[in-house]
Structure formats: C-alpha cells, structure tokens
Swiss-Prot record:
This is Phosphatidylserine decarboxylase proenzyme. Catalyzes the formation of phosphatidylethanolamine (PtdEtn) from phosphatidylserine (PtdSer). It is a peripheral membrane protein. It comes from Salinibacter ruber (strain DSM 13855 / M31). The gene is psd. One of its GO terms (biological process) is phosphatidylethanolamine biosynthetic process. The modification Pyruvic acid (Ser) is found at residue 169. Residues 206-227 have a biased composition (Low complexity).
Length: 227
C-alpha cells in the first residue's frame, strides 16, 4: 500500500511540470496566432501606404528592382520577432499584378542576403494612380512556413489581411522614389495602421502647384507694398 501511494505521488510530481509545460505551450501558440482587428487611418485609405507587418523597421535602403518596379526603389525592411503579431496586411489598395512563391534558404531574417536567398513570396501591386509597390514575405531561421491568399488579378484594399509567416520573419516593402516616405529606421510599426508613406495623386500635384504659384504672388505683394 505504501509503495502504491509513493508511486501515485511520484506520478503527480511528474505530471505537474508536464501539465505546466503543456498549458504554457498552448498559451504561447494562441498568443502567437492572435489576429487583432486593425482599422487603417481614414486619410490613408485612398493613397496611403500602411505597414504590411508588425515589427521594427531595421533598414531603409535605396536599390534597383528589376523584378516588378523595373527601376530605382527604396526598400523598407521590417523585422518581426516571435512576440509580434504575424498576420500580414496589404500595404495599399490596388490590383495584384505579380504573385510568386520562391523556395530558398533560412538565413536569419535580418541577414543582408535574406531577401534574395531565403524562402519568400513576392507580390507586385499597382495602385489606381499607376504607382507600383512590391512587398515580400521572407522566412527566417525559425519561421519556415509562409502562408498567403493573394493571386494575380486580385483587387485588394488598404490593410486587408493576406497571409502569415510563422515564428519570426521579415517583410520587405519596395516603393518608387515618387512616394512620400514617412518611415524611419528603428520605428516600431503595426500592420494596417502605421502609415509608412503616401502615393502621389493628381490632387496632391495640383495642391503643390497652387502653393508654388501662391508663394511668388505673396512676395510680389510685399515688394509692391514696400515701394
């Protein structure tokens, strides 16, 4: 009887830590796959570019993109830690003209060659103004599974969910020089809500022209008053 009781106690001593690990693991998985509601700012719905992923902007660099933009571009690289929300969102409204999955290596997500060597998916989007954007889901050393639901020909809206990269990864966004960039290196961003830039529109062009015309007129008025 004593032996049986000892075995029962011993089983519970083992079962306690195992149960704790199981509950902790389940809690982490539920936390990792959380998908909070996000609403883009009202002034970003038409011509804004929002962050396609949660994380930190680790680099903003100039480069040439022969794949889709076919010219000079500025690349915004966002690193996602395992604690960030990993649901990805479309950066701007428009039509998906390019969608391709590329198998590859699993370098750490912040490696300079990760965007060229790692497993990734690439999406080219044309905004209604004609401006083109390219964004890439890039797997890291831990994240080895990319999921997305975008196809060529899809019409998408700013901030719409489109996929996930699991357990630490990176997102690259390439924009042409004409885009007014707001992103800063080191900035912490949230997918679907943080505005990274703005696409030039005919309205913004007319506004700039009007301001440029008004400035000389004001100067002329001051000179006339002085004389």
């Amino acid at each position: 009887m004593l032996t049986g009781g000892a075995l029962w106690v011993d089983a519970w001593l083992w079962r306690g830590p195992m149960l704790t690990l199981a509950v902790g693991g389940l809690a982490f998985v539920l936390y990792f796959f959380r998908d909070p509601e996000r609403t883009p700012p009202a002034d970003a719905l038409e011509a804004g570019i929002v962050a396609p992923a949660d994380g930190r902007v680790v680099e903003i660099a100039e480069e040439d993109d022969p794949l889709y933009l076919e010219g000079p571009a500025r690349r915004i690289s966002i690193f996602l830690s395992p604690l960030d929300v990993h649901v990805n969102r479309v950066p701007a409204r428009g039509v998906i003209e390019h969608a391709e999955y590329r198998p590859g290596d699993y370098l750490v997500a912040w490696h300079p060659k990760a965007s060229e060597k790692n497993e990734r998916s690439e999406f080219g989007l044309r905004h209604p103004t004609g401006t083109k954007l390219l964004f890439k889901q890039i797997a890291g050393a831990v994240a080895r599974r990319i999921e997305y639901d975008l196809r060529e020909g899809d019409t998408v809206e700013t901030g719409a969910r489109f996929g996930i990269v699991k357990f630490g990864s990176r997102m690259d966004l390439l924009v042409p020089p004409s885009v007014e960039l707001h992103a800063k290196e080191g900035q912490v961003v949230r997918a679907g809500t943080t505005v990274l830039g703005r696409i030039p529109t005919p309205e913004s062009g007319r506004s700039s022209s009007a301001e440029a015309t008004a400035a000389p007129s004001a100067s002329s008025a001051r000179r006339s008053s002085a004389s």
